[in-house]
Amino acid sequence: MSKKKDRLYGRLVYALSLAYNQAAFGKGKERHANNKPFEEQTMMVANRVTDGGFGWGQIFKKIQEIPNIKDPDMKKAEMVSIIVYAAGWVLWFEEFMKKGEARGNLDNITGVVGSKGLPRMEE
């Protein structure tokens, strides 16, 4: 990474590295890894089974919970976990697209495949 890019995106790299460290060495490894690669861990399997709904649900849940967390370190850890779940969601979506399963129904109110019964947001 060039010095200019470091100056422009260094803080983003820092935030992403927090997510990597949490998943690879911290809470993620302790609770979820079971010595499996990231793409084979429970989160990724759950995303596949729920057409991405698991990742969306975890992100939504954490967004709801974070304002009630008083401890700053715990609050930050939960924020970082959103990045991990979002990364898993991106990887699930790439798999989904490669399989040719995209049918144009990812634009509903939740952004999750399979929630066709929910009302659409008005533009």
Where are these regions (language model features)?
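Intrinsically disordered, low-complexity regulatory regions
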Residues: 1-123
